Design a protein with these regions (language model features):
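Generic helix N-cap/helix-start motif at coil->alpha-helix transitions
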Residues: 25-30
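Internal interaction segment
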Residues: 180-200, 208-266
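An ectodomain-focused feature that recognizes extracytoplasmic/extracellular
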Residues: 94-156
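Alpha-helical linker/edge segments of TPR/alpha-solenoid repeat scaffolds
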Residues: 71-101, 112-113
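Short, charge-rich amphipathic alpha-helical segments embedded
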Residues: 44-79
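C-terminal motif of bacterial Sec signal peptides marking the signal peptidase cleavage site
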Residues: 15-18
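Hydrophobic/aromatic side-chain positions at a characteristic register within alpha-helices
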Residues: 31, 38-39
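Mid-length scaffold segments of soluble, non-membrane domains
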Residues: 142-182
Length: 266
C-alpha cells in the first residue's frame, strides 16, 4: 500500500512538473515578443504582450517574474522619455513667458500675496483714479481674467460683453460678486470676469469693440485700441504661463513615476 502511494505521489509530481513546464513554454513566445517590442521602442505593444501572459498563463510563474521585471523597464524607459520631452517643452514655455512678462507690469506684495499678477502698466490703479476702465490680467499660474472698475451708479454686473460692429459678441461671466469701494468723491464697483485666449482673438479680429457691463442694468465701459493691445499681450502671457504650470505638474508626476519604478527595480 505504501509503495502504491509512493508511486502515485511520484507520478502526480511528474505530471505537475510537466504541466508547469508546458505552461512556461506556452507563455515564453509572449515574453519574447514583449522583449522585441521593447527593443523596438514599441512600449504599448510590449505592455500588451506582458498583460497577455498574466491573463492567459497565470501559473507560468517563472515567465511572469521575467515579464514583471521587463514591465518595470518599459515603464521606466517610457517615463524617462516623456520627462525629456516635457523638460524641453517646459524650457520653451518658460522662455516665452519670461519674454512676454517683460512687457507688462508685475504686481505683487510679498507681505500678503503668494501669487503675483501681470497687466499693462497703463492699467495701474494709481494711473486710473476715479476712472472706469477694464484691466486684462493674468496671475503667475496663467489664470486669465479681466477686471472691470466701474465708477458710478450700481450695476451689480454678472456679465462683461464685447460687441463687434457687425453685432456679433462674446460674453464673459463674473467669477464672484462685485466688490464695492466708496470714497468722498464717489463709488467704484470692481468685478472680475473669467477670460480665455479666444476673447482676445475675437477682439483682435475687429477694428472697434464696444464693452458693456450687464447686471441690474447695462452700462458701457471705455475700451480703446490700447486696451485691445493690452488684452492681446496678457492673453499671450496667460497661455505661456498656463502651459508652464501644466508642464511643471506633468514633470513632477513623471519624476514620481521614475522614482517609483527605480525603487521597484532594485
Amino acid at each position: 500500500m505504501k509503495i502504491r502511494h509512493f508511486i502515485l505521489t511520484l507520478a502526480t509530481g511528474f505530471t505537475l512538473a510537466n504541466c508547469a513546464e508546458d505552461v512556461e513554454k506556452l507563455a515564453k513566445p509572449y515574453l519574447d515578443r514583449a522583449q522585441q517590442s521593447y527593443a523596438n521602442n514599441q512600449y504599448a505593444l510590449a505592455k500588451l504582450q506582458i498583460d497577455s501572459i498574466k491573463q492567459l498563463y497565470p501559473k507560468a510563474f517563472d515567465t511572469r517574474t521575467q515579464a514583471q521585471a521587463l514591465l518595470i523597464e518599459v515603464e521606466l524607459t517610457e517615463a524617462n522619455t516623456s520627462k525629456c520631452y516635457t523638460d524641453s517643452l517646459l524650457a520653451i514655455a518658460q522662455e516665452k513667458a519670461t519674454t512676454l512678462a517683460a512687457t507688462l507690469y508685475f504686481d505683487k506684495d510679498v507681505r500678503y500675496q503668494d501669487i503675483g499678477t501681470y497687466y499693462a502698466s497703463r492699467h495701474r490703479t494709481e494711473k486710473n483714479v476715479d476712472k472706469s476702465y477694464l484691466r486684462p490680467q493674468t496671475d503667475e499660474r496663467g489664470v486669465f481674467t479681466i477686471t472691470a472698475f466701474y465708477r458710478g451708479r450700481a450695476i451689480g454686473a454678472h456679465t462683461l460683453r464685447f460687441t463687434a460692429p457687425d453685432g456679433s459678441y462674446v460674453d464673459l461671466p463674473a467669477t464672484a460678486e462685485p466688490y464695492i469701494m466708496s470714497d468722498a468723491t464717489g463709488r467704484t464697483e470692481r468685478t472680475d470676469f473669467a477670460a480665455t485666449p479666444e476673447v482676445a482673438h475675437f477682439v483682435g479680429a475687429h477694428t472697434t469693440i464696444t464693452a458693456t457691463l450687464i447686471g441690474e442694468r447695462k452700462a458701457q465701459i471705455p475700451f480703446a485700441k490700447t486696451d485691445a493691445q493690452a488684452l492681446a499681450q496678457v492673453a499671450d502671457l496667460a497661455s505661456a504661463l498656463k502651459a508652464s504650470t501644466e508642464l511643471q505638474a506633468a514633470q513632477q508626476e513623471l519624476t514620481r513615476r521614475i522614482t517609483f519604478y527605480e525603487q521597484r527595480r532594485k
